[in-house]
Swiss-Prot record:
Species of provenance: Aspergillus terreus (strain NIH 2624 / FGSC A1156)
GO cellular component terms given for this protein: cytoplasmic stress granule; eukaryotic 43S preinitiation complex; eukaryotic 48S preinitiation complex; eukaryotic translation initiation factor 3 complex, eIF3e; eukaryotic translation initiation factor 3 complex, eIF3m; multi-eIF complex
Keywords per UniProt: Coiled coil, Cytoplasm, Initiation factor, Protein biosynthesis, RNA-binding
Underlying gene: tif32
Protein's name according to its UniProt entry: Eukaryotic translation initiation factor 3 subunit A
Assembly and interaction partners: Component of the eukaryotic translation initiation factor 3 (eIF-3) complex.
Biased amino acid composition, Low complexity: 908-917, 945-955, 978-993, 1004-1018
Family named by the database record: Belongs to the eIF-3 subunit A family.
Functional note: RNA-binding component of the eukaryotic translation initiation factor 3 (eIF-3) complex, which is involved in protein synthesis of a specialized repertoire of mRNAs and, together with other initiation factors, stimulates binding of mRNA and methionyl-tRNAi to the 40S ribosome. The eIF-3 complex specifically targets and initiates translation of a subset of mRNAs involved in cell proliferation.
Protein's GO biological process: formation of cytoplasmic translation initiation complex; translation reinitiation
Region Disordered: start-end pairs: 617-641, 795-1040
One MF term in the entry's GO annotations: mRNA binding
Domain PCI: 339-523
Length: 1040
């Protein structure tokens, strides 16, 4: 069976309205729901689908069908989000508006039902809308028959409250993580917060917060989707921040402190992601709510730190507004009263920080625990502080900012009593009026109990410094507070036991004798509170308590310290050299530090430059990577969009083809049925029952119909012709009878017409005569007024002419004045333009002269630089030539030494030395410090040479080996300066002592390896016949 043809949305809506009109709302909803969830609906235009969705929403709200509404809205969002986002917002707003309207109507109905009850009766307070009926309520409804307010609200209002809550949740699920529907998502979240606040829905508020938190966490997971939100976008992040701040405000109003703290963490996470700084008004709200949360959790240290941050923000906002650098919309409005109130709370909250730990376990052990450290680190990060706050640091910060002058007088006096001039014997008397003033203020009343704990701690700490034991009665008398805040002896003993349990106090209570004994173990170590402890005091006992005198334990513990200090002072007086050496060492260290400071500073600057360059490179790489990622993502998104668009176009094209084909088939079938019905009812003479309808088509039916119509037409023409003949005979008879009575009728008609004419003529003449008489009378009456009218008109004309002349002259005067003014302005403008042109010309000339002067200076600098470079180049050439001469001399000396060694080895006298040029530079003479070995000295040999007349046996002539190529201007090693078969050079002629050569060098001088620029077989063959082939050094030694 083929699928049913697609029905247009207009027809579906019309059918649903018809069903609603006859009371079939569920059937209408079913029809609309099936149409919207059908795949064929995707090709329908959005403008025709929107009324269908609005009707579905109305029916779902009326029947409380949240599941059907959710399915339809999801399908509609998938259809419309790529083309028209506004229609989705319209439908969802309508959905929420109808649900809220139903809740209001339900409340009105419940009020009408309970109009006979007392107006002050408690309202319904169902803890969980998803668990309305509990076993207890069912049993109570069964046993009790009375209709109470709670039962009425539970039966009438609560179901609609549950439906409204499901509506908000459904809308948020539909709009989540969609950048196009982001504004609507934030608006719906704010409406849901207001719903929870208005109806005090604490359970639903927790679920709502968890739902929004999951949406943000899943945003990164689904970031690759087509319309996913981007938390890196400042506007998106700002909207989420606004939502979280509203969530924080509602949580504080509902007193859900855990949810408020989690909202604070969400805000801190979003602020860490934000690239733009948060507004001061938002941060002020942030710190204010955070202070309230810490106060409820009795974390007085971080409560005071939050107040301190809030006060700093108010000061910054006031300074910004005073300097005119910010707007009132972004900065909280601050007055002097607000600053005084904030300063008072900062100081009071700091005073309320416990000096010792207030937790039930041992403070020292808990503070070391890793969980406690992590918690304190988290709280410190939430406050935006670099390190955990302490009581001493908060007081120091408050004093530096002058909070003591801004605070209220009683708070200032309380600070002086507790921190500056604490006296245990009179503390309660001094503080009683102050506590009464603080207790009278509802906002400050919460600090009375922690202040009592601080006072008791100070009291016992200072009593332990003075007394070893005191009576309980005496302690009870000292700890007397005003009446509303009176402390009983049991509370004091509980405080003592708690302090002893944690190790903060060392007190024993003897109830028999009624005495308090302070522990005075001289070998006990004083406990130092751990930084960041739960109590909040990170200061040592010495810094937090006014020292009256040292305890025996401190005296025993500090004995070695005092002894060392005394010995140090004695050594300084007894041995002056000790002090001098200490001062000298200090001065040496200072000099060394000063000497290395400049270098260290330069290294630090260099490291800073390197770090900045690395940071810039990392930032550039990160930005480049982000740009590439964004480009890839944008290209991928465009490709996906194009592919999706092409797919939708293909599907729409296929659906259109199929729809046209189905429509053609349907029209063909309907036409066939219609023709059959016409043949059956309209055309006579054809028996349809005898026709085979299976083989019948439109052409055959049309031919049958035309044949039958032609037959009927012929029959009709025959009947008309017969009837016409009959009518012609009757008409001819009627006219023959009328001819007899026509003359009589003509005479009667003529007489009636003459009578009517005479009557009309007489009446017309009478009316004309009457009108003439009336016109003549009117002329006589008006003729008397003509002179007066003419004089009046002349008068008015003269006045108007005079007025016109006055106005014309005034206009001419104004024209002349404005003309003169215009001429003056034009002259002034031309003069000003001329001056500007002259000034511009002068500036241009000055600029050209300056440019010419700079060009000449630049040319002179270039000439000077070229001259300097030429001089430096000449100096380098001279230096290179000098080095070449030195290298040549060195080479010559080495060749002479090698020649002497070769001659000495051969047992021959050295040949006459070649003439050697005198050195151009003076060098120190070489000294032969080696001892004589029995041979003649060089002087003896020189004398023998002179006696022989300078003649010497010539060495056998040998072919001179080709000199190796030498690199210009560089050092040439000895083995590259001469070939292995070269003859030894003659010794120098000036008689300079030869250079010492090691034995292994002398032995291997005759078998020098080939130079690096020669091949092993490049040398000419020597006399020994061994120069044609390269032989390793070790093999040459073996051959020798």
């Amino acid at each position: 069976m083929p699928p049913p043809p697609h029905i247009k949305p207009e027809n579906v809506l019309k059918r649903a309205q018809e069903l609603i009109a006859v009371g079939q709302a569920p059937a209408a909803l079913n029809v609309l729901h099936e149409h919207v969830t059908s795949k064929r609906t995707r090709s329908s235009p959005i403008s025709s689908l929107e009324p269908v969705m609005l009707q579905i929403v109305e029916l779902c709200v009326d029947m409380r069908k949240g599941k059907a509404a959710k399915d339809g809205l999801y399908q509609y969002k998938n259809i419309a989000q790529n083309t028209n986002v506004g229609t989705i917002e319209v439908v969802l707003k309508k959905f929420i508006e109808l649900a809220e309207k139903k809740v209001t109507e339900a409340q009105t109905k419940a009020d009408e039902i309970q109009s006979s009850l007392e107006s002050a009766a408690p309202s319904a307070n169902v803890e969980d809308l998803e668990a309305i009926e509990t076993p207890e309520t069912i049993l109570l409804a069964t046993v009790s028959g009375e209709q109470s307010r709670d039962r009425t609200d539970r039966a009438v209002v609560t179901p609609w409250l549950k439906f409204l809550w499901e509506t908000y949740r459904t809308v948020l699920e539909i709009l989540k993580n969609n950048a196009r529907l982001e504004v609507m998502y934030q608006t719906t979240a704010l409406q849901a917060f207001q719903f929870c606040l208005k109806y005090t829905r604490k359970t639903e508020f927790r679920r709502l917060c968890e739902l929004l938190r999951n949406h943000v966490q899943n945003a990164a997971k689904y970031s690759a989707q087509m319309h996913a939100i981007n938390l890196s976008d400042p506007d998106t992040l700002q909207r989420h921040l606004d939502t979280r701040f509203q969530q924080l405000n509602v949580a504080v109003e509902l007193e859900l402190w855990q949810e408020a703290f989690r909202s604070i963490e969400d805000i801190h996470t979003l602020l860490s992601l934000s690239k733009r700084p948060a507004k001061n008004v938002m941060m002020a709200n942030y710190y204010e709510k955070l202070a309230r949360i810490f106060l409820v959790s009795e974390n007085y240290l971080f409560h005071a730190a939050a107040w301190s941050r809030y006060y700093n923000l108010l000061r910054q906002s006031a300074a910004t507004l005073a300097a005119g650098q910010g707007t009132k919309k972004e900065n909280p409005s601050v007055t002097e009263a607000d600053m005084t109130k904030a300063a008072s709370f900062v100081l009071l909250s700091a005073l309320a920080i416990p000096v010792i730990s207030t937790s039930r376990s041992r403070g020292a052990l808990v503070d070391v625990d890793e969980v406690r450290k992590n918690k304190n680190t988290r709280l410190t990060n939430l406050l935006g502080m670099a390190q955990p706050p302490t009581r001493a640091v908060l007081f120091k910060d408050a004093m530096n900012k002058g909070l003591l002058k801004r605070a209220r007088p009683e708070i200032r006096e309380l600070y002086n009593i507790l921190e500056v001039d604490f006296h245990p014997l009179s503390i309660c008397k001094k503080i009683t009026p102050i506590l009464k003033q603080i207790g009278s203020d509802p906002e400050m009343e919460k600090y009375v109990v922690p202040l009592q704990q601080v006072i008791l701690t100070r009291l016992f700490q200072q009593l332990s410094q003075v007394y070893e034991s005191v009576e309980l009665k005496f302690v009870y008398e000292l700890a007397q507070f005003p009446d509303p805040f009176q402390i009983t002896p049991a509370m004091i003993e509980k405080f003592i036991m708690n302090g002893c349990k944690k190790g903060d106090l060392a007190i024993r209570v003897d109830h028999i004798s009624g005495v308090l004994t302070f522990d005075s173990d001289v070998f006990s170590s004083a406990k130092a509170l751990h930084p960041g402890s739960a109590a909040g005091s990170a200061e040592s006992e010495v810094g937090s308590v006014q020292r009256l005198q040292n305890t025996p334990a401190e005296i025993a513990r500090l004995q070695l310290t005092r002894l060392a200090k005394t010995l140090h002072v004695s050594c300084m007086y007894v041995d002056p050299s000790y002090n001098e050496s200490r001062i000298q060492a200090k001065q040496t260290a200072q000099a060394r530090a000063l000497a290395g400071a400049a270098k260290e500073h330069e290294e630090t600057l260099a490291r800073r430059v390197i770090i900045e360059k690395k940071k810039e490179a990392a930032t550039d790489a990160l930005q480049r990577k982000q740009r590439e990622e964004e480009t890839r993502k944008r290209i991928r998104t465009q490709q996906l969009q194009e592919a999706e668009k092409q797919r939708l176009l293909d599907e729409q094209r296929e659906r259109e083809k199929k729809r046209i084909k189905d429509e053609q088939d349907r029209i063909r079938q309907q036409e066939l049925k219609k023709q059959l019905e016409e043949l059956k009812s309209g055309v006579k003479g054809i028996d349809i029952n005898e026709i085979d309808l299976q083989d019948l088509d439109a052409n055959r039916l049309r031919a049958m119909k035309l044949a039958q119509l032609e037959k009927e037409k012929n029959e009709l023409n025959d009947r008309i012709r017969t009837t016409g003949k009959r009518i012609d005979h009757l008409e001819r008879a009627f006219r023959r009878e009328e001819l007899k009575h026509i003359p009589e009728d003509y005479e009667a008609q003529k007489k009636r017409d003459m009578e009517i004419y005479e009557a009309t003529k007489a009446e017309t003449l009478k009316e004309a005569e009457l009108k003439h008489k009336e016109a003549v009378a009117l002329k006589h009456r008006l003729s008397r007024l003509v002179p007066h009218f003419n004089s009046f008109r002349k008068e008015v004309s003269e006045k108007r002419h005079e007025e016109f002349e006055k106005r014309r002259k005034a206009a001419e005067r104004d024209f002349e004045a404005k003309k003169k003014q215009r001429v003056k302005e034009v002259q002034e403008r031309r003069r000003r333009e001329k001056m500007e042109r002259e000034m511009a010309e002068r500036q241009r000339k000055e600029e050209e002269e300056r440019a010419q002067r700079e060009e000449e200076e630049k040319r002179a600098r270039d000439e000077e630089r070229r001259r300097v470079l030429a001089e430096e180049k000449a100096k380098r050439e001279e230096e290179r030539k000098r080095l070449d001469e030195i290298a040549a001399k060195q080479k010559q000396r080495e060749e002479e030494a090698e020649a002497r060694r070769a001659a000495r080895k051969a047992g021959l006298e050295p040949a006459a030395p070649a003439a050697r040029p005198e050195p151009t530079e003076r060098t120190a003479p070489r000294l032969n410090i080696a001892p004589r070995t029995g041979g003649p000295s060089w002087r003896e040999r020189q004398a023998a040479k002179e006696a022989a007349g300078g003649a010497a046996p010539e060495a056998a002539p040998k072919e001179e080996a080709p000199q190796p190529a030498r690199r210009p201007g560089g050092y040439v090693p000895p083995h590259l300066r001469s070939g292995s078969s070269a003859a030894p050079a003659a010794p120098p002629s000036n008689g300079a002592p030869e250079r010492y050569v090691p034995r292994h060098a002398r032995e291997s001088s005759s078998s020098q390896p080939p130079s690096r620029t020669q091949t092993p077989g490049s040398d000419k063959p020597s006399e020994g016949g061994s120069a044609g082939k390269w032989v390793p050094r070790w093999k040459q030694q073996q051959n020798q």
